[in-house]
Amino acid sequence: MKKSALAITLASLLSPVSYLQAQEISVDETIVVTANRFKQIDGAVLAQTVTVTKEDIRRQQADSLFDVFRTLPSIEVAQYGGRGQSASIFVRGGSATQVLVLVDGVRMPRAIMGGIDFNQFPINSIERIDYIRGARASIYGSEAISGVINIITRASIDDDASRVSAGYGSNNHKKGTFAVSKPVGEGKHIKGVLGYEKTDGFNVKPLPGLNDGDEHGFETLNLKLGYQQNFSDNFSGYVGFSTYSNEYDYDNSSYGNPGWGTVDKHEKKTGEVEYVGADLSLEYSKDVYTSELKLAYGQQDNYDLKSGQSKSTGDHVAIEQFNAIWLNSYSINDELSIGGGLDYRNEKLAKGYLAPSDWGPAKDYNPEKNPRTNIGISAIAQYALNAWTFEASVRNDENNQFGNNTTWQTAAGWKVYEGYELTLSHGTAFRAPSFVDLYYPGYEMPNLKPEESKNTELSLSGVASIVDWTVTGYYNQIENMLIWKGAGMQNIGEAEIKGIELEVKLDTDIVSHEFYLDYKDPVDKSGAEDTQLAYRSKRGAKWNAYATFDQWTLGSQYLYQGERFNGSTRLPSYSLWNFTASYAVNSSWDINAKLSNAFDKNYEMYSGYATPGRQYFVSADYRF
């Protein structure tokens, strides 16, 4: 099946589910197709991109997206404790709300409340993760200021990888998965994944003499179903369904303050997340033209209550989201390709209730615009000639609350000589305020404006012998940043982030290596004096290494995180080591073991919250 350079570009940036899983692609230009890796036409994608396959995830023996993200370049992670606790990611120094997170090319519903708690998403159904750094709002719209992460759960149509797995580890951590992914006839495929996980956890917020002996655990049950079919050589379709139900404990205890008239409070709370989603996509592709239509619906309920009480006694936030996306690409000739997208999004806060608490009586969210709708129209053009590639994109978002937002991006790539390429890009981006920013009960600020940014970056990449390397410098200016002050959120923030990244990948005999270094200066310019942006470090380093020999696969992951600040509170730098081992008993059975935080490092990601010490997990996989 023939795909143009732009078709692949659009696929990777707009809707990678269909295109990146193509097994055979024929074009007039050189294509790099590496098994279980990112597929692209040479020079087609002028952005820094990393793809993580399900094989990579299994090799890491990751429990969650948190485990995966912390191994990727220019991502800092932070969570309030262990498995299942609230977590955030910071890409290139941007905030947790300035990175766009997609599932199969569609926004996660929770984003309308501000930020994505990716620790709640089941990892056992993931086929691939595409991670793009830099501003991409001219393709995706709101939130794509510092990067885009697309979590892909749709399998390729010829995937045949059914398995059963079970494991046990520290803190009474139990996990099991039953997964079927296989062809069921000519051009037909089914996928089904059922997973369960539970851990007792540990005390994530120890307050001596107040909550001694408390444990804050996590439990999840999840299901993913998918069916796809090639109706003809040119026409295909897919339908999917997913649901998960999670429960996690956290601590809301506090010491009393006699001066304020408060007393010690020991309070354990429980959060519950219930998600249901379905999606349908149809794709037509013939010669130089490709078109895809995708419809998706998602509903998520979040409950927050005192442990042991019923859900009716606590907070309840319910979100509904509907997406309709239509993408088209056309190759005019061997040099020039064009494409465009139209997407409609309807976001509804179906329920927004805050139960009575120490802070006051019961309250309800009362959005002025509910549901909130957004229509985005985007266009992209790419011209490739000899050693040069040029790309330009523009997008307009019409929102029934914020009006019009237009973003654009230009990029150029120059193959200096064989194996070396220089790329330069500049683009604008924005982030629309969330319902929490706008309508948090008692602190409503309905007139907030979107955050805005300008991003410029320069990259040089090369392949020399066994070494594949890239150096990237970037400069991101963010204005109208939303900051909590006084009676609520205000557009008074400003940030300036300069950074440089180094990626090196190489193989030495039986060992494959990935080195990531980053240095940045994340400056908060909102106050009278410049300060370091909260929870962002200036320095970071990561090394992932894996060796395969005989029936063994051994791995190690190293992470260095520089010091961070939260106001005047300093969080020291730390280094962590994880080790993994897998033994293939035969063609069907694997035995796996993982040692996390192997040297039992004591560190903090958020001030006052404990992190996991040394932990082990052992598991067995059976393929059929």
From Swiss-Prot:
Residues 1-22 form the signal peptide. It is a multi-pass membrane protein. It is found in: Cell outer membrane. Residues 40-154 form the TBDR plug domain. The keyword Cell cycle does not apply. It comes from the Bacteria. Transmembrane segments: none annotated. Residues 159-624 form the TBDR beta-barrel domain. A motif (TonB C-terminal box) lies at residues 607-624. A motif (TonB box) lies at residues 29-36. GO terms for cellular component: cell outer membrane; pore complex. Pfam families: Plug, TonB_dep_Rec_b-barrel. GO terms for molecular function: ABC-type vitamin B12 transporter activity; porin activity. Keywords: Cell outer membrane, Ion transport, Membrane, Porin, Signal, TonB box, Transmembrane, Transmembrane beta strand, Transport. Belongs to the TonB-dependent receptor family. BtuB (TC 1.B.14.3.1) subfamily. Involved in the active translocation of vitamin B12 (cyanocobalamin) across the outer membrane to the periplasmic space. It derives its energy for transport by interacting with the trans-periplasmic membrane protein TonB. This is Vitamin B12 transporter BtuB. It comes from Vibrio parahaemolyticus serotype O3:K6 (strain RIMD 2210633). The gene is btuB.
